[in-house]
């Protein structure tokens, strides 16, 4: 048989993992459901959210990552463009963030008696997971008068996070006799400990 509003009176969470408004057209919108269950949490996980020019665009996989700037086409030796090997970020990050939000909303509903409507865009999830590069890009857009380095680096202007650290020495991977080691002493306290440990306080 069909699904009725009464089927949702004891539900904690309803997840709409389709184009926004699909359940609404079936008479099962958040507004409909909360009439029979005020504590219900309605989580809509879509590609590009519920507003904007891409609201109803069907897509999946790497499409969210290209929208967020996480992946770009590559060229082969003949100059032909192709999509490089890339782990899909948005289609995993979006639902994961939705699960966190839904569980938090359930805890709130049990305390307050009020449900919640949650909107999750998988493209937004991809952009969130790529915050290192985004923040680094924005850092270089700041006025030169704004210092982005620190005293130990002579206040040298540089991007944040791990982006742009190819020439860095305090946050770097090094090849060793038996493999590789990841050296992470970007913070002042850790760099000081390292300098003391190797007897080179002149580098601090």
Regions found by a protein language model. Give the residues of each.
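Helical "substrate-binding/catalytic lid" subdomain
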Residues: 122-153
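Active-site Gly/Thr loop motif
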Residues: 143-171
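Mid-domain beta-loop-alpha active-site segment that forms a flexible
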Residues: 63, 88-103, 121-133, 186, ...
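Aromatic-enriched alpha-helical interface/lid elements that frame and gate functional surfaces
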Residues: 164-165, 169-204
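Short beta-strand segments
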Residues: 44-45, 122, 183-184
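Oxidoreductase and adenylate-handling cofactor-binding alpha/beta cores
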Residues: 95-116, 132-142, 195-202
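A short glycine-threonine-serine/GTX helix/turn-capping micro-motif
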Residues: 82-93, 115-117, 161-165, 169, ...
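N-terminal helix-loop segment corresponding to the beta1-alpha1 unit
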Residues: 1-114
């Amino acid at each position: 048989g069909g699904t009725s509003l009464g089927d949702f009176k004891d539900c904690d969470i309803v997840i709409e993992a389709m184009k926004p408004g699909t359940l609404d057209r079936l008479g099962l919108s958040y507004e409909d459901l909360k009439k029979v269950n005020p504590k219900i949490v309605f989580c809509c996980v879509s590609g590009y959210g519920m507003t904007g020019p891409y609201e109803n665009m069907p897509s999946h996989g790497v499409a969210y990552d290209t929208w967020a700037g996480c992946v770009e086409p590559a060229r082969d030796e003949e100059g032909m463009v192709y999509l490089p090997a890339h782990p899909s970020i948005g289609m995993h990050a979006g639902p994961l963030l939705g699960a966190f939000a839904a569980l938090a909303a359930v805890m709130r509903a049990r305390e307050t008696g009020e449900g919640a409507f949650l909107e999750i865009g998988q493209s937004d999830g991809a952009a969130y997971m790529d915050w290192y590069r985004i923040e680094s890009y924005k850092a270089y857009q700041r006025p030169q008068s704004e210092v982005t380095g620190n005293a130990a680096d002579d206040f040298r202007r540089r991007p944040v996070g791990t982006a742009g650290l190819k020439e860095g020495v305090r946050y770097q991977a090094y090849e060793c006799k038996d493999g590789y080691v990841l050296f992470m002493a970007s913070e002042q306290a850790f760099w000081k400990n390292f300098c003391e440990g190797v007897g080179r306080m002149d580098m601090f």
